[in-house]
Amino acid sequence: MNIDQIQAILPHRYPFLLVDRVVEVAPGEKIKAYKNVTANEEFFNGHFPGNPVMPGVLIVEAMAQAVAILAMKSNGEVDMAGKVIYLAGVDNARFRKPVRPGDRLDIEGTVVKRKGPLWKLHAVATVDGEKVAEAELMATLAKK
């Protein structure tokens, strides 16, 4: 999925759209996506001057946006009019290595379980094949 297709699903826009491309999506199962982290990211101005590091909460947000795409695609195109996926919870978030300008943040998300409008998902973020973060995410489907 290119950026136009992503924007047709997610309500986020610059500077808060944190998924640049979806490489693979298997509805009801998994997603692979990425964010190109550039030196032009606004958050690097203050986090941290002279030692730029992507904030962990934004890594979690990037993972949440990727799994939101997975949930939306899993629910079916017809059912999505007027609906959005909201982040409902984050558990067991772990950050292993810093993400810096020039990195490509690869995200893999999998469905753990679904009950009605509530989704439990697992997401892992890597850079150059090394795990930088992971979390269990809860999401809920709701009206806009």
Where are these predicted regions, by residue range?
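Beta-strand-rich interaction surfaces with strong enrichment in secreted/lumenal proteins
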Residues: 7, 50, 95-97
